[in-house]
From Swiss-Prot:
Native source organism of the sequence: Mycobacterium tuberculosis (strain ATCC 25618 / H37Rv)
Residue stretches making up the ABC transmembrane type-1 domain: 66-259
UniProt keyword annotation of Cytoplasm present: no
Family recorded in the similarity comment: Belongs to the binding-protein-dependent transport system permease family.
Keywords tagged on the record: Cell inner membrane, Cell membrane, Membrane, Sugar transport, Transmembrane, Transmembrane helix, Transport
Highest classification ranks of the organism: Bacteria, Bacillati, Actinomycetota, Actinomycetes, Mycobacteriales
Name under which the protein is recorded: Trehalose transport system permease protein SugB
Domain of life: Bacteria
Coiled coil: none
InterPro entries: BP-dep_ABC_trans_perm, MetI-like, MetI-like_sf
Intracellular or extracellular location(s): Cell inner membrane
Membrane topology: Multi-pass membrane protein
More details: Was identified as a high-confidence drug target.
Transmembrane region(s): 8-28, 70-90, 102-122, 137-157, 182-202, 239-259
Length: 274
């Protein structure tokens, strides 16, 4: 019975992984095909070419967009995780007036669909000079990413024994020192998980980046891919779009592979009570 169940789950896992990987493999295949064979319907290219990859880097638009995506994503991640860690610590450890209000406000932010806020954000940023700038994207990204960071980290902070923090305070540490030198190192898996999730959110966003930017000064990689055009009005830039999609997927895959164990530890924190 045990062997049959193991075989069943192995087959099911294989099917799920195959289902998830098939679109990625198809996009990768498209990125290696010349324009003449893009629509041949074959997964394995009959002719392999790297012209699509060379083409997207031929101009400076995609390179600038990649730099913008990396910079905006990293700054958003650092600020959101730092603020989220402090807020999550307060939610998990402290009792203070307005605690429920803070949690409710975080929930309220997640309830709003981003598209309903595009027009107000556009008008506000045009009025104060933040349109088509890094801060013009970083600020709304932080706003939408903070609830995610708070919920991820608060669950992890609740699992850290109180005794460790009390022992640090008995040794003369201030609450701030106990947080920085005891709680934060122990919460490293949760911090890494929150950082990865926030970075993925900022890296993959298209709606806000498309609405709040206009030039290569601030457009991100997803926007650059959406703006790809063929060499003529009769040519579809399918291969270029596929190549760009593969390029912007690589950093996420690398991050997840490097921090896989910490991500799993962070996401499963609080699932089992010891």
């Amino acid at each position: 019975m045990g062997a049959r169940r193991a075989t069943y789950w192995a087959v099911l896992d294989t099917l799920v992984v195959g289902y998830a990987l098939l679109p990625v493999l198809w996009i990768f295949s498209l990125s290696l095909k010349p324009t003449s064979t893009v629509k041949d319907g074959k997964l394995i290219p009959s002719t392999v070419t790297f012209d699509n990859y060379r083409g997207i880097f031929r101009g400076d638009l995609f390179s600038s967009a990649l730099i913008n995506s990396i910079g905006i994503g990293l700054i958003t991640t650092v600020i959101a995780v730092v603020l989220g860690a402090m807020a999550a610590y307060a939610v998990a450890r402290l009792e203070f007036p307005g605690k429920r209000l803070l949690i409710g406000a975080a929930l309220l932010i997640t309830m709003f669909p981003s598209i309903s806020l595009v027009t107000p954000l556009f008008n506000i940023e045009r009025a104060i000079g933040l349109f088509d700038t890094w801060p013009g994207l970083i600020l709304p990204y932080i706003t939408f990413a903070l609830p995610l960071a708070i919920y991820t980290l608060s669950a992890f902070f609740r699992e850290i024994p109180w005794d460790l923090e009390k022992a640090a305070k008995m040794d003369g540490a201030t609450p701030g020192q106990a947080f920085r030198k005891v709680i934060v190192p122990l919460a490293a898996p949760g911090l890494v998980t929150a950082a990865i999730l926030v970075f993925i959110f900022a890296w993959n966003d298209l709606l806000l980046a498309l609405s709040l930017t206009a030039t290569k000064a601030a457009i991100t990689a997803p926007v650059a891919i959406a703006n790809f055009t063929g060499s003529s009005q009769f040519e579809e830039p399918t291969g270029s779009i596929a190549a760009g999609a593969i390029v912007i997927t690589i950093p996420i895959i690398v991050f997840v592979l490097i921090f896989q164990r910490r991500i799993v530890a962070g996401l499963t924190s609080g699932a089992v009570k010891g």
